[in-house]
Amino acid sequence: MSGSKDYDGFGKDTQVAALCWRLRKTGKIQILLITSRNTGRWIPPKGWPIDGKKPHEAAAIEAFEEAGVEGKAAAEPLGFYKYFRDPDYDFKRSSEAFIYPLRVKGFAKSFKERGERKVRWFSQKQAAQRVREAGLKRIIRAFDPDDL
């Protein structure tokens, strides 16, 4: 994918997401997922573009607000995945999210959406099984921090 850019190049139905990850002492990768507030399904932290922020910066802000994640997202996305919006919006409307890897360094005790979502670590395989979107499953399965 090409270099980072401001959100002017994104479509109105494009969001940014963070693939929050950590490496266990065993060398195994774990992926952090949160539940959607509307449906309770497992998703990565994601949200809308933020004026004046680069896409990876906005993804990191969303991860902090939704899961209390502290860390810096990589400037290059891993790719993008398509999904259908939650029923409270327009269930038939397709959107896409560019997803940026973010190595988790810690967690804040207080954050905007604390208590509104479940936040849980999964093995890479389990995370790919828990998400619904085929493109996101592929991105999670293929993720290798050595490629960053």
Model-predicted segments: where are they?
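NUDIX/MutT-family hydrolases
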Residues: 97-141
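Short, solvent-exposed loop/turn segments that connect beta-strands within catalytic domains
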Residues: 24-30, 89-92
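Short aromatic/basic micro-patch
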Residues: 43, 94, 121
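Conserved Nudix-box catalytic region and its N-terminal flanking loop in Nudix hydrolases
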Residues: 26-70
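Acidic, metal-coordinating catalytic segment for phosphate/diphosphate chemistry
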Residues: 1-24
